[in-house]
Amino acid sequence: MMKKFLLVLIPVLILYFYNLGYNAVWMPNESFYADSAKNMLKSGEFLTPVYNGEIRLNKPPMTYWIVSLGYKIFGVNELGLRFFHALLGVFTGVLTYLLARRITGSKNTALLSFLILSLSFIFIANARYASPEVPFTFFITLSLYLWYEYFTRKKEFLFWLALIASSLAVLTKGPAGFVLPAGVVFFYLLLRAPKELLKIKYYAGTLMVFLLSGWWFLYQYLVHREEFLEVFIKENVKRIYALQRDPFYFYALDINVSFLPYSFLFFFALFWALKEKRRELSFPLVWFSFIFLIFSIVKMKIPVYIMPAYPAMAIITADFLNSQSLKKVKNLSLIFLWTVLVLATLALSLYFKFSATLFPLIPLLLLPFFLKKYELLPAFGAFAFLFYLSSVILPYVEQFRPYREVGKEIRKLDPKNELRTYELGFFHHNLPFYADRVIIRRTKEVKKPAIVLARKGSFDCEPVRKWELYTSSESRFFKFMLDIKRKKRFEEFLLCVIK
């Protein structure tokens, strides 16, 4: 079985780590973690993140610490920025494998669970990108895995390890790091073993999580009271009811895209598990249902919010695929998903005129048919699509992102960081990282002497360099790619020295 697992693990490792450090820091979100972690290493202040000279308390410090560790090992660069996020992504897949094997007793279901999670589009995208989402999902999954092991094996120390993992989730993304695993455990026990909830250790454990993670929130409240309260209420309270209002069914639709390549099959699997009353799947069913319903009720909805439910979704889907039920429905769905992925890869290659680079992937796409492993069709299609994306499309995109060059030129003009540096007309969030300084923005007056990077027409000066730079968010990646092709939202920026 270990050989089979390695055969599955190796291509996943390729997808997660190949060209990982090739692309410059993405805008806007990745820039916050890149620059703040860099500042932590420079200043030695690891409790209060500082981005572009300003305190940033939107998220607790765990993600910044993870990036800082990467910088320590690999240097302050893009590989260091993303390495441990990719590694935690793989580890989340391994935990899903172990949990699926424990729950179902099937090695094939466990392998499929690992594949389904690891190849999920939004999951792998976030694993190759520095943000709190994958570390948060990892710690939630670790907490629930350890608790389930405690509950089934009755080993006390696993219970307390589960609480430590939950504390780390809180230090990654706030109170949800405790609320989500605690809610899953509570409702599962309510269904299966309500007397377990009477044990005092669950309430002592709640206090333990509060002590292990609450110290950072208390520290920020005491030191930066106003800034902390404003951000804490916005991030943890207003998102529930005030910031934006998305429809209740948002995630029911979003799963069809975000959980590709096995997305449609999940709904069949969910229906099958409930109809057949698959008792062994009660834990992942409660896990998915609780997270899905909680975030469906929350007014502000973002696809990554339900990513902590993905391991449970992967296990449910894998067990369905490994069963003998609804074979015709499964096979038709698998072929349909494979076809969608093949057509998407082909469309991408033709649109960007890279069709020749697609030929080596054709045998890979057809391999499941020869092996008669139809459950692997979406996995092979996803591998081809994602490998094509990381080996061809991402390097192509990088030629339209000269941020390293812009930062290098600014450092060359002012190596000692003695001049004020401005950006006018737009703010590129990764510029503080590459220029290695505070970038002044939203100003009505430029104080001389200074370096100014200005959108053409926003400031009159004699440029020493010019670049075409993108003037929108890169987080909607396929929109960004279309803008590159159509040459939209790119503007000329002038770099000037004002004396």
UniProtKB/Swiss-Prot annotation:
Protein name (Swiss-Prot/TrEMBL): Uncharacterized protein aq_1220
Membrane disposition: Multi-pass membrane protein
Record's keyword terms, sorted: Cell membrane, Glycosyltransferase, Membrane, Transferase, Transmembrane, Transmembrane helix
Molecular functions per Gene Ontology: mannosyltransferase activity; pentosyltransferase activity
Top-level division of the source organism's lineage: Bacteria
Keyword Membrane: yes
InterPro entries per the UniProt record, alphabetical: Glyco_trans_39/83, LipidA_mod_glycosyltrf_83
Gene Ontology process terms (BP): lipopolysaccharide biosynthetic process; protein O-linked glycosylation; response to iron(III) ion
GO cellular component, one term: plasma membrane
EC number, as in UniProt: 2.-.-.-
Family, per entry: Belongs to the glycosyltransferase 39 family.
Subcellular location: Cell membrane
UniProt enzyme class: transferase
Taxonomic path: Bacteria, Pseudomonadati, Aquificota, Aquificia, Aquificales
Residue ranges of the TM segments: 5-25, 79-99, 110-130, 132-152, 170-190, 203-223, 252-272, 286-306, 332-352, 354-374, 377-397
Annotated Pfam families: PMT
